[in-house]
């Protein structure tokens, strides 16, 4: 028996795939209620439109910034009740992945981590704007990623780059 630590296990961890969330933050946030206060006196029959987008960029070393943008427009009848947009971002340490795994991680896994924070920020803004709470349904980023890959293949485009 030896008093020496098993350095082989540490070396394997350093050489294998690594993923670590470093920071989550709001990059941009906006709320507009163009028809207030008149909109508050109308019967509330909302229709919700959600637009989402993700982008990623490399930082120094093996660090990446992923930004999830959610834009929500709620109409009450023919009028816009409110528009809210959040850019929820995260810094991730990612290394040791092949191109396909890196693309999936940046395009689906990281946005999945960011979504609950963006959803909460939107809900808080809506409530502070004196509107009923808006709880967005979960988003299947894996399915969206797969659809985008299929669309690109059918269009003859190269698969999603790992960085932009």
Swiss-Prot record:
GO terms for cellular component: cytoplasm. InterPro entries: SecB, SecB-like_sf. One of the proteins required for the normal export of preproteins out of the cell cytoplasm. It is a molecular chaperone that binds to a subset of precursor proteins, maintaining them in a translocation-competent state. It also specifically binds to its receptor SecA. It is found in: Cytoplasm. It comes from Pseudomonas syringae pv. tomato (strain ATCC BAA-871 / DC3000). Homotetramer, a dimer of dimers. One homotetramer interacts with 1 SecA dimer. Keywords: Chaperone, Cytoplasm, Protein transport, Translocation, Transport. One of its GO terms (biological process) is protein transport. Pfam families: SecB. The keyword Nucleotide-binding does not apply. GO terms for molecular function: unfolded protein binding. This is Protein-export protein SecB. It comes from the Bacteria. Gene3D superfamilies: SecB-like. Its main location: cytoplasm. The gene is secB. Belongs to the SecB family.
């Amino acid at each position: 028996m030896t008093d020496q630590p098993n350095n082989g296990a540490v070396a394997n961890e350093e050489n294998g795939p690594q993923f670590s969330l470093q920071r989550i933050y709001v990059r941009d946030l906006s709320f507009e209620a163009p028809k207030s206060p008149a909109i508050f006196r109308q019967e509330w029959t909302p229709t919700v439109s959600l637009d989402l987008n993700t982008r990623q960029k490399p930082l120094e070393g093996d660090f990446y910034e992923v930004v999830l943008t959610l834009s929500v427009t709620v109409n009450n009848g023919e009028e816009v009740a409110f528009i809210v947009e959040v850019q929820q971002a995260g810094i991730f340490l990612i290394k040791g992945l092949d191109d396909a795994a890196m693309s999936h991680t940046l395009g689906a896994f990281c946005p999945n981590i960011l979504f609950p924070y963006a959803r909460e920020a939107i809900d808080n803004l809506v409530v502070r704007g004196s509107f009923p709470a808006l709880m967005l349904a979960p988003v299947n980023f894996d399915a969206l990623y797969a659809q985008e890959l299929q669309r690109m293949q059918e269009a003859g485009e190269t698969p999603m780059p790992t960085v932009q």
